[in-house]
């Protein structure tokens, strides 16, 4: 298990459902264009693991999601989701232009600027931010 502190990431968006008791379900993640987001913003395939399908469903494995008592506390949920250990689960080399396998992709990207994703790594998925929000 290798830690990648300060790993560069493209612009990410998250969607989830919180019930009245603060229980979280239906976590999703997507990659958006490097611009001010609008409903027409282009979405890209997520190039890493633990995210699958056209909806961007996040696999949290055996990890339990915390409960959030206030809407403000939900701001920490993306950090929690990104801290879940990643493996090859739901990884597909076809989701990056380089065609690299997971470990090789991480090693290749660990010192790159996030702008590199947009020129050399990301593949549009044919969706917009409006599609992602609509679920």
Language-model segments: residues:
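Compact alpha/beta protein-protein interaction domains typified by the UBC
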Residues: 1-69
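Domain-scale recognition of soluble eukaryotic interaction modules
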Residues: 38-135
């Amino acid at each position: 298990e290798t830690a990648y502190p300060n790993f560069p990431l493209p612009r990410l968006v998250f969607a989830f459902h919180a019930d009245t008791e603060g229980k979280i379900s239906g976590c999703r993640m997507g990659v958006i264009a490097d611009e001010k987001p609008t409903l027409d913003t282009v979405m890209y395939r997520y190039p890493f693991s633990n995210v699958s399908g056209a909806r961007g469903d996040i696999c949290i494995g055996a990890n339990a999601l915390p409960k959030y008592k206030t809407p403000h506390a939900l701001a920490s949920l993306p950090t929690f989701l990104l801290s879940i250990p990643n493996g090859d689960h739901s990884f597909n080399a076809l989701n990056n232009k380089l065609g690299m396998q997971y470990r090789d992709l991480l090693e290749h990207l660990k010192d790159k600027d996030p702008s590199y994703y947009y020129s050399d790594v990301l593949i549009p998925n044919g969706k917009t931010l409006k599609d992602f929000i609509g679920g």
